[in-house]
Curated annotation (Swiss-Prot):
Keywords (A to Z) from UniProt: Ribonucleoprotein, Ribosomal protein, RNA-binding, rRNA-binding, tRNA-binding
Coiled coil feature spans: none
The keyword Cell membrane appears for this protein: no
Name of the protein in question: Small ribosomal subunit protein uS13
GO biological process terms held by the UniProt record: translation
UniProt cross-references to NCBIfam families, sorted A to Z: uS13_bact
Length: 121
């Protein structure tokens, strides 16, 4: 099993798809990494040689991926919260940040509905 950036890449998948298991690498970036490393995108991960894996690791090393990228994202969110920006407040309150409506929908960000207090006479 190939291990790149601390992640076990699924051996049955093509190189391009397997690389997307790494946080911070999508299809486009995975394809560019494979092309730069000289690895065919349709080659299975289990069929990659050690030299090919090493070239892929070198090209991935250029990008912020996994822990570094997660830390970077968390620090930028923390900075927004500390500055007291509107976006920071939305993050803090667990509401949508990018202007989506919240009167209806937004359930993913807001979480499950709370039971409404019933008024009894």
């Amino acid at each position: 099993m190939a291990r790149i950036a601390g992640i076990n890449i699924p051996p049955q998948q093509h190189a391009e798809i397997g690389l997307t298991a790494i946080f911070g690498i999508g299809r486009t970036r995975a394809r560019k990494i494979c092309e730069a490393a000289g690895v065919p995108v349709t080659k299975k991960v289990k069929d990659l040689t050690d030299a090919e894996l090493e070239r892929i690791r070198e090209h991935i090393g250029v990008f912020a991926v996994e822990g570094d990228l997660r830390r970077e994202v968390q620090l930028s969110i923390k900075r927004l919260i500390d500055l007291g920006t509107y976006r920071g407040m939305r993050h803090k309150r667990g509401l949508p940040v990018r202007g989506q409506r919240t009167r209806t929908n937004a359930r993913t960000r807001k979480g499950p509905r709370r039971a409404a207090a019933s008024l009894k006479k």
